[in-house]
Structure formats: structure tokens, C-alpha cells
């Protein structure tokens, strides 16, 4: 069992939360990411149930976290963090429009996906996407890649090699817009 696993286990045990396959995927991710220089800012696209936010707080405690997701998922994430007593309300900022300023004392910035353009050119050091691109259309994925590239960050992406969406659109990992 890795140190990352042990850290997650302590936090999850305190809140009577079980480690599941999604948590394990994030533990493996942080076991890889902890080998990079600690980023000052990280953006997670499509975190679910705060798996990434929690791991980031444990692995890179000095980094600011940008979490972008559907509004209803962000509400759920906020409630999880509140219940687990991981961050105080004073450390969390919710972005309401593209022109909001990032407040200096905020640790976690929550961005509803309908205003994703807020993330353009924010000098974010690391972007992470684990299993949420496979739920988006290729047009939406291309929009995220444009935002990611505008920040010139490291990018960690873990999604299926192939997925057919409900509407019939087929996604191929190798066909994501990786090039510059």
C-alpha cells in the first residue's frame, strides 16, 4: 500500500467513506504525479465526488485548485467537502462569470462548465482529466484542449481508448486534438 493510499484512507475513514475503484484510480494517478515539481496551480476537469480535489490537497498542499464541472456536480462536491471538513467556506470561491477575479486567499476555485472560458490564459501549471472526456462530445473536448493549451501546462489525461456516446458519436482517445 502506497503512502498516497494511506493518506486517502485516513481522510476517508474519518468521514466513513469507502475507497472504491474511482478512488484507486486517483491514488495511482497521484502516485505518478507526486514525481513532478509541485505545481502552484492545478485544474481538474470533471472531478467526481472530490476524488481529485482530496488527493491534490494531500499531495500538493500548497497548490491552488481549479475544479470545473457541471453546476449540479460542483454543488455535490461542495457538500462533500463541507461534510468531510476538508476546506472551510473561506477557502472556496465559486466563479459566477468569465470576468470574476480570483480572490487571493482562496484554495479551491469552483467553475461551472458553462463558463469554462474563465480558465483561458490563467497560467495553470497542471491540468488533469480522468474519465470525463469520455462523457463529452468531440466539440466539447476540443474547447477544453484550447483552454488547456492557452495555459501551456503539463496535462495528465486518463480516458477510455474508445467510447460510443448515447447519441452515436464515437470518441477515440488517439483522435483527441493533442497537436499544437
Placement of each model-derived feature along the sequence:
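Conserved SAM-binding motif I beta-strand of class I
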Residues: 64-70
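Conserved class I S-adenosyl-L-methionine
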Residues: 39-48
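S-adenosyl-L-methionine
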Residues: 80-120
